[in-house]
Structure formats: C-alpha cells, structure tokens
Amino acid sequence: MNTIHVDVVSAEESIFSGEARFVALPGESGELGIFPRHTPLITRIKPGSVRIEMADGSEEFVFVAGGILEVQPNCVTVLSDTAIRGADLDAEKAEKAKLEAEEALKNAKSEVDLARAQSELAVMAAQIAALRKFRQKR
C-alpha cells in the first residue's frame, strides 16, 4: 500500500509523525488534498483542521493556526506556530478566547490593534470549527 510520511510540528513540539494514505488541509487558496507521490509544493496554510487518513483507514485530526506546508513525493511537513491535536482541543477555552477577540475587535484603537484582533478572531473561529469537525468524526 502506498503511504506518505507526515510530520506536523508546532513551535513547542512535534504533534504528529507517521505514515498516512492521504492528508487534507486548508491551503491559502483553498482545500488541499495530498496523496503519496504528490508533486513538490511549498505554500502557506490557513487556520483550520489537518485531516490525516492513516494506512488502516482511521483518521487523526490536528488544528493548526496557519503556517507553512512543504510537500515532497514521499513526505509532508506542516509547520505551525500553534498546533493542537483534535483530542486536546478545549471548547470552553476556545469560546472564551473567541469572545475576548471579539471584544478586542470592538475596542481596537489603531489599525495594528484591529489587524491583531481580526487575526485572533479568525484563528479562534477556525479552532471552534475544527473542534466541531473532530467531534462529528468521533
């Protein structure tokens, strides 16, 4: 069976390393699907869920807050400042952070504050969506 090696790495630690049949993730220009022997590619990724289909058919989910994707024919590497295993996502914490980002957006006093709040809100909304997707698959 054809597989591709997948590494998902955050600034703090390696989140996932293993063999997979398929990887799906949110590219900057749309959803990307990576199979073994994919053409080499480097691109930015948006906040969202990385779905890793294992060789046995099971799935692993990882939330990433954006980052960089590198694809080689036999290897996929996802680099993200923040990456959280689907099983470790905390709905209460994510909702609280989303509310704080919405409040920061309302109270932004400069364009920098506004951009920072918008970015944080987008990340938290993507994390909540990833959490819902993970719960549906369980």
From Swiss-Prot:
Principal subcellular localisation of the protein: membrane
Membrane topology of this protein: Peripheral membrane protein
Gene3D superfamilies: ATP synthase delta/epsilon subunit, C-terminal domain, F0F1 ATP synthase delta/epsilon subunit, N-terminal
GO cellular component terms attached to this protein's record: plasma membrane; proton-transporting ATP synthase complex
Cystines in this chain: none
Compartments where found: Cell inner membrane
UniProt keyword annotations, A-Z: ATP synthesis, Cell inner membrane, Cell membrane, CF(1), Hydrogen ion transport, Ion transport, Membrane, Transport
Origin superkingdom: Bacteria
One GO molecular-function entry: proton-transporting ATP synthase activity, rotational mechanism
Known function: Produces ATP from ADP in the presence of a proton gradient across the membrane.
Similarity comment: Belongs to the ATPase epsilon chain family.
Protein name: ATP synthase epsilon chain
